[in-house]
Structures are given as C-alpha cells and as structure tokens.
C-alpha cells in the first residue's frame, strides 16, 4: 500500500533512486566507482538516476526505509545500503540495466 501511494505522489518511483549526503566519504567513493564504471563500460553511461540529497530533501528521504547512505532503490525496492565497493556498485548498475533499459 505504501509503495503504491508513493508511486502516485512521486512519478520517479519506478526507476533508480540514489540517496546521498554531501561530504559523506562513502557516497563520494560510490560516485567515483560509478564514474569509473561509466568510463570502463559505456553501457552504464545511459543509466538515469534520481539523486536525492537527504539533507536538502529530508521530507522526501523520510518516505523511504533506509538508515545509511549511499543507498540505492530500484523500482521501489532497496538494492544496496551503506558503504559499497566497486563490485557492489557494478551490481546495482547491472540490475538497473536489466530492469530499466
């Protein structure tokens, strides 16, 4: 029920959503891995994500069930939460590719 209500309010719910905090070293590292993967494998460059700064958009972030950043949701379900290595970011991007493109 909650996801359905959010989908009505937030049309972007069906996609990749990335929650982050400025200054978070784990978020910065995740973004660096993402950029590296885009350079290494151009297929990742086509992935669009809604990026939500949880400090500036706290009202929106509070609607999602997570505690740690970086955090990735895909089509309403959590894919990854917390510090991530390059392989974990690749797994998020691969899942997004398989479901979105």
Where are the model-predicted features located?
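Local sequence-structure signature of Cys/Sec-based thiol-disulfide redox active-site neighborhoods
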Residues: 6, 10-40
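Generic recognition of short, well-ordered alpha-helical segments
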Residues: 28-32, 63-64, 84
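Alpha-helix termini
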Residues: 38-44, 97-100
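Thiol-based oxidoreductase modules, predominantly thioredoxin-like and allied folds used
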Residues: 44-58
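CheY-like receiver
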Residues: 60-63, 92
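Structural micro-motif
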Residues: 63-73
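Non-catalytic, surface beta->alpha helical segment in thiol-disulfide oxidoreductase systems
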Residues: 73-101
């Amino acid at each position: 029920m909650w996801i359905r209500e959010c989908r009505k309010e937030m049309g972007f719910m069906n996609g990749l959503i990335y929650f982050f905090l400025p200054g978070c070293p784990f978020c910065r590292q995740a973004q660096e891995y993402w950029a590296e993967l885009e350079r290494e494998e151009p297929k990742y460059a086509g992935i669009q994500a809604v990026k939500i700064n949880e400090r500036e958009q706290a009202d929106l972030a509070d609607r999602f069930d997570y505690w740690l950043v970086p955090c990735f949701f895909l089509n309403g379900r959590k894919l990854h939460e917390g510090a991530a290595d390059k392989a974990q970011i690749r797994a998020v991007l691969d899942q997004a590719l398989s479901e979105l493109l």
